[in-house]
Amino acid sequence: MSFSPLIRQLIDSLRILPGVGQKTAQRMALQLLERDRSGGQRLAQALNAAMEGVGHCKRCRSLSEDEVCQLCLDERRDDSLLCVVEGPMDVHAVEQTGFRGRYFVLKGHLSPLDGLGPEAIGIPELLERIEAGAFSEVILATNPTVEGEATAHYIAQILAGKGLIASRIAHGMPLGGELELVDGGTLAHALAGRRPISL
């Protein structure tokens, strides 16, 4: 089916979303145009408002409508703990655990093949944040990928000479998981990170 230039532009715009391919973008575009024009208008208004009104917190670099986000303004948080994550969605995931420390959001992970070095992901800003704070421990909560591990290792090496504890989030067996369904790499990490049972 051949689409008009405006429909083609809408389809191409929808394809920038993660996990949205050509067919899904076509279905979304046609749904909005044929069956839910008011929903499409609301989507356009909400997207425009978010693009105009949401920026990055100047302290933690998470997404915020204000210069400093609500998490950074919360005086009840533990100023001795800094959790370093790869992106804003990771902040929300860690918050669900009840973590009460502070955050710093990198812009991804180190990936030399993609041209992402320390400056590109914000490591100089991280070091400034650490030096400006009163942190005793930096929790490296980057993803358990090759790049995430390399990023955590790189940061830990820098922090080694600063008298700070650099810790890494544990990873391994998911709660409720079955051994036979877990891949070998995950199981190897779980075995290497085993700990005694406290009674």
From Swiss-Prot:
Which InterPro entries does its entry note?
DNA_Rcmb_RecR, Rcmb_RecR, Rcmb_RecR_Znf, TOPRIM_dom, TOPRIM_RecR
One record GO biological process: DNA repair
Q: Where are the zinc fingers (C4-type)?
A: 57-72
Recorded hits in CDD domains, A to Z, give: TOPRIM_recR (cd01025)
In terms of PANTHER family, this protein maps to: RECOMBINATION PROTEIN RECR
Protein family (similarity comment): Belongs to the RecR family.
User: What's the name of the protein?
Assistant: Recombination protein RecR
Please report the organism this UniProt entry assigns to the protein. Ectopseudomonas mendocina (strain ymp) (Pseudomonas mendocina)
| This protein's encoding gene | recR
